[in-house]
Amino acid sequence: MLTDPDLPQEFERMSSKRPASPYGEADGEVAMVTSRQKVEEEESDGLPAFHLPLHVSFPNKPHSEEFQPVSLLTQETCGHRTPTSQHNTMEVDGNKVMSSFAPHNSSTSPQKAEEGGRQSGESLSSTALGTPERRKGSLADVVDTLKQRKMEELIKNEPEETPSIEKLLSKDWKDKLLAMGSGNFGEIKGTPESLAEKERQLMGMINQLTSLREQLLAAHDEQKKLAASQIEKQRQQMELAKQQQEQIARQQQQLLQQQHKINLLQQQIQVQGQLPPLMIPVFPPDQRTLAAAAQQGFLLPPGFSYKAGCSDPYPVQLIPTTMAAAAAATPGLGPLQLQQLYAAQLAAMQVSPGGKLPGIPQGNLGAAVSPTSIHTDKSTNSPPPKSKDEVAQPLNLSAKPKTSDGKSPTSPTSPHMPALRINSGAGPLKASVPAALASPSARVSTIGYLNDHDAVTKAIQEARQMKEQLRREQQVLDGKVAVVNSLGLNNCRTEKEKTTLESLTQQLAVKQNEEGKFSHAMMDFNLSGDSDGSAGVSESRIYRESRGRGSNEPHIKRPMNAFMVWAKDERRKILQAFPDMHNSNISKILGSRWKAMTNLEKQPYYEEQARLSKQHLEKYPDYKYKPRPKRTCLVDGKKLRIGEYKAIMRNRRQEMRQYFNVGQQAQIPIATAGVVYPGAIAMAGMPSPHLPSEHSSVSSSPEPGMPVIQSTYGVKGEEPHIKEEIQAEDINGEIYDEYDEEEDDPDVDYGSDSENHIAGQAN
């Protein structure tokens, strides 16, 4: 029965129709393919065999026990049936066995499958005829086999590739089934290792997922932080922009306020510029005085420095603005219009800061009155001239705190132009002027006499008396001036000379106190001291009085610096080549040359400077430099050259001689002797707040058109250093920034000595 050639084919067909697991695992299929290959090989060798997928480890299991009755049943049936029936029964039994144990062959190797097939073949061959009770079970097995085939057909129709999750589940199912079917777990190879590997894989996956989750959370947190920081930055930027906008708004508001203030100031300036800067009297004048003063063009602005003119009728050019100049040059303006101008100017002055002090317009007598009617000498003892001097002179508030007062030694018959000296504080002046005007002598004022012929005549007589007195005093002073000149005040080198000079100074001071001409401390002539205005004393002494020097202390010159040492000779050379060159131009030339020089070229002059400084320190150990304030001088609104100024001085002296010789009443102003200074009205910043009504010997010209200019009379009697002190600043009104001109060489003189000698000998 076993040698029937049909059996191998039948078994081959049965084995090829092995039921697969419902999950279609790959291992079972591989095992079946391997068993088929072996069967074919054996058939080719002529050794047919039965290969049933029976596991080796099943004999002790219930399945194997069930298998034995089945095999016995198949043997019995085979014994009682015909070969055909036996063959069919074997086929059914084989299918049953295959279907029963097919799941157990999935995890076994091909060798185990082959062994199982051989054992099954042997068991089948060794089985005898089974009992009838077993047939029902075999029929059930056949039914199961048919069901298995249908399932296989369904599985074959499904896709060969199943999802990876099904593969994993199928492996797990196989492992569990093998573990259940086999009591010996140790015989299952790879089970602990696979579990450990899977556990490791699971742990790795868990770790990866955890790390990925952490990364995602960290990235999410970073994004949140970044978004929060961006929001914060945006908020800060918005706040900053808001602050900037607020600041810009505040700045714009401030700019608008400043612009508004500027506009207001410009409007005020325009209003003031349209009005002529008129001279406002300290006390209210009458309309006739205003009209007379305005018609003559004598309109002096309070903040404008008076600089006398030089034209033939001697018009006083006092108005810096075009409006005022037009008003001065237009005599056709009616008194009412001029009064309105004055009133407007007065209102502007009252509104303006207190630094602008109104001055007193000097009246003009016109053709009806002689020009000598409105000036008195303040050096006389009579009170009325003092009051007239106080009110007859316009105030000059822009001048530097220096005085131009001095004596007129060569004009004993000439009246004196009073130069008001006002302290830098404006309050004391305002307080002193009304006090002076309230006195009985103040009522005899210039403006009060403008249209009063009797008063004018009286003033003329007083002026003549003062001239006579000045003539007598000048004759006495001529000798003293010569002595002072011979001593050489600037170049005293011996103690004897200094002692003589100091004694002479004391004598002059005593003379001054006796005559009572200079009772005001502000006008203390400490070196000259003569009430008649001695020409031999430099007016710079008066200026230095405000710097706190003692009454008997002589002026100590500063030691020359390197530039002064070098410029001394260079200046003389330039003047020799260009006698008419202005000192400002000379200083510019010298300054540019000095800057262009190298240090090696300057070295000798620096050495000379050191030597002079050492010598000066040894001679004057207590010396302290006290700079005097700078000032500029303009004549007719412009700076004059030396030649032009000398020509003007010559004309003044010639006309003065004519007036003295002919005995005319017209008074020509005389400047302080020893000070070649064209400005007759100057402000001196003196410590005393009182008006210098008692000690001004400068002649005052009653005629508004008369140029008030200081001459060079009596310069012969003055010492050389006086010339050098005044030549740079007073003659030309020029102040050098390079050095103090008064420290120049005493021999340098920009004015001609011949003119000074002639002026000194004129009377």
UniProtKB/Swiss-Prot annotation:
Region span, Disordered: 1-29, 77-141, 359-426, 714-763
Modified positions (Phosphoserine) in chain numbering: S21, S370, S411, S414, S439
Keyword Nucleus: yes
Compositional bias per record (Polar residues), positions renumbered to this chain: 77-89, 102-111, 120-129
Basic and acidic residues bias: start-end ranges: 132-141, 716-726
SMART domains in the record: HMG
Modification type Phosphothreonine: residues: T131, T372
GO MF annotations, alphabetized: DNA-binding transcription factor activity; DNA-binding transcription factor activity, RNA polymerase II-specific; RNA polymerase II cis-regulatory region sequence-specific DNA binding; transcription cis-regulatory region binding
Keyword Transcription regulation in record: yes
DNA-binding region of this protein: 556-624
This protein's GO CC annotations: chromatin; nucleus
GO biological process: asymmetric neuroblast division; cartilage condensation; cartilage development; cell fate commitment; cellular response to transforming growth factor beta stimulus; chondrocyte differentiation; positive regulation of cartilage development; positive regulation of chondrocyte differentiation
Family matches, as PANTHER family: FI18025P1, TRANSCRIPTION FACTOR SOX-5
Entry's disease: Lamb-Shaffer syndrome: An autosomal dominant, neurodevelopmental disorder characterized by global developmental delay, intellectual disability, language and motor impairment, and distinct facial features. Additional variable skeletal abnormalities may also be present.
Protein name (record): Transcription factor SOX-5
Organism for this UniProt entry: Homo sapiens
